[in-house]
Amino acid sequence: MEKIPSFQLDHIRLKRGIYVSRKDYIGGEVVTTFDIRMKEPNREPVLGAPELHTIEHLAATYLRNHPLYKDRIVFWGPMGCLTGNYFLMRGNYVSKDILPLMQETFRFIRDFEGEVPGTEPRDCGNCLLHNLPMAKYEAEKYLREVLDVATEENLNYPD
């Protein structure tokens, strides 16, 4: 079998950031898939499953309720490697286009107080797998170290 494009990416040189992973053309529309990379692959500890699950719930809720973008949001979900998330939006975007939206999203997560949306047994397939304090910690770290100081190497995959 052929290696899929995401496995051809040089993960050794990959930094934390926001990257366009792919663009799919469906009918007359483009769906842009973003790699929201929160950890450097194979060089730092991955995100714990509980905090990544909480980030998923909070980011998906925030984005699907966003007054400007809610109709363009297709999907937000964790990567199996636990180094970040995939984010799909309807439209033809580059990473820089969504940097302000990601800053807003991660500030929302960092500042969130109260019960995490969708964490009741009837709402979630693993409602006990959550960690709000660690999700807030990881959101703050990603904001401070990556999103708020992003350069081209955090917005474009390495060649």
From Swiss-Prot:
E.C. numbers: 4.4.1.21
SUPFAM superfamilies in UniProt: LuxS/MPP-like metallohydrolase
Cofactor(s) named in the record: Fe cation
Domain of life: Bacteria
Cofactor remark from the record: Binds 1 Fe cation per subunit.
InterPro entries: LuxS_sf (IPR037005), Metalloenz_LuxS/M16 (IPR011249), S-ribosylhomocysteinase (IPR003815)
Enzyme class at the top of the EC tree: lyase
Catalysis performed (reactions): S-(5-deoxy-D-ribos-5-yl)-L-homocysteine = (S)-4,5-dihydroxypentane-2,3-dione + L-homocysteine
Keywords (A to Z) from UniProt: Autoinducer synthesis, Iron, Lyase, Metal-binding, Quorum sensing
One GO term (biological process): quorum sensing
Residue ranges of the TM segments: none
GO MF, one annotated term: S-ribosylhomocysteine lyase activity
Function per UniProt: Involved in the synthesis of autoinducer 2 (AI-2) which is secreted by bacteria and is used to communicate both the cell density and the metabolic potential of the environment. The regulation of gene expression in response to changes in cell density is called quorum sensing. Catalyzes the transformation of S-ribosylhomocysteine (RHC) to homocysteine (HC) and 4,5-dihydroxy-2,3-pentadione (DPD).
NCBIfam families: PRK02260.1-4 (NF002604)
Family: Belongs to the LuxS family.
Protein name stated in the entry: S-ribosylhomocysteine lyase
